Amino acid sequence: MNALFVINDRADVAMLLDAAVHLGQDDLPPTAARRIMAQESIIGFSTHNEAQLRAGDQEPVDYLAIGPIFATGSKQNPDPVVGLEELRRLRALTKKPLVAIGGITRATASSVLQAGADMVAVIGDLYPEPCTKSALRARTEEWVSICR
């Protein structure tokens, strides 16, 4: 299984670790991140609506994220839910890879991918209860099989 190591928000840390960086709307602008990171570095950018997606499509980023697709408990003040129909509509606005994020579970991941997302980003449904090594390995294998 291949995985991409992505640093959230901090292009400087990503550069030092030779990792990818994911930037939000209130972080360092993608053009500034691209100036300090290696040209081949992967940069992603969060969007939450059509206007942000259109603007993000003009940025020097390798992928765009859109969400939250569903209600999420991972953010204190989440943006309004995008939903599957809006995801399907927004997919047509960019040729860049589109990562769906927000409230995605094993039960909903397939429908999110079918709606046009190229990838899903998951926080809450990633960790099993209890979070033992064997349970985490089994959960990871479930996610890998869903996303193939």
Model-derived features: positions:
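Glycine-rich phosphate-binding active-site loops on the catalytic face of alpha/beta enzymes
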Residues: 25-33, 65-78, 109-146
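Catalytic cores of alpha/beta
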Residues: 5-19, 48-62, 93-100, 104-122, ...
